[in-house]
Amino acid sequence: DLVRSRGLGDVYKRQGQLISHKANFDLTKVDLCVANELEERHEYNAWWYCCIPIAVVRPDNLPMPIFIRGDDIEYGLRNCKRLVTLNGICVWHEPFESKYSSSMYYYILRNQCIDNSMHCPGYDANALKADLRSQVMGEVNRYRYKNADLLIRGVRDFLKGIDWLEQTDAEALHKEIMAYGYKAQ
């Protein structure tokens, strides 16, 4: 199959939502191959899919220490202002959905909060509360109470600020988060 499951070059919206251009295009269809070549405005591309000028990669402009989910989003939004996508070039990897881990709930929401605070001027306390409420209730309704706790902890840790993030032993935190969540089966 030549179906593009995800478009390349995303538009970043409030609340950490990435809107992917040209997702699910069946590239065996001529009209979709032509449409795939149309230029679109995009603000982000995953760094594992980009050639970033070496002048950008400097000691004073490194990625934030928020590895696992969202680190490439923040770095891409900050540095990759002019993106060029080329038809036929792709990266094949396991879909994120099949890499389930409870710990991701912590990292995804915490890191979305960090990204939004830096790149979405309209992201305020009300938006944060709405995000948290929606995601926590979704997990509670599925009886995934540990995931709900991890979401709340992610927001609490975000609210501790940059000093806390810089001083935290990321490896120890990760071990703690991994030990708390549900184990994949």
Regions found by a protein language model. Name each.
Residues R110-Q185:
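Terminal low-complexity segments of carbohydrate-biosynthetic enzymes
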Residues N45-Y49, I54, P59-L77, R82-V91:
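Donor nucleotide-sugar recognition loop
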Residues D10-L32:
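Extended repeat-based solenoid scaffolds, especially LRR ectodomains
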Residues D1-Y12:
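Single conserved hydrophobic/aromatic residue that forms the stacking wall/gate
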Residues R78, C90, S98, C113-I114:
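Gly/lys/ser-thr-rich phosphate-binding loops in alpha/beta enzymes
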Residues F25-C50:
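A recurrent flexible, glycine/aromatic-enriched loop bordering the glycosyltransferase active site
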Residues L86-S102:
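Active-site donor/metal-binding and catalytic loop motifs
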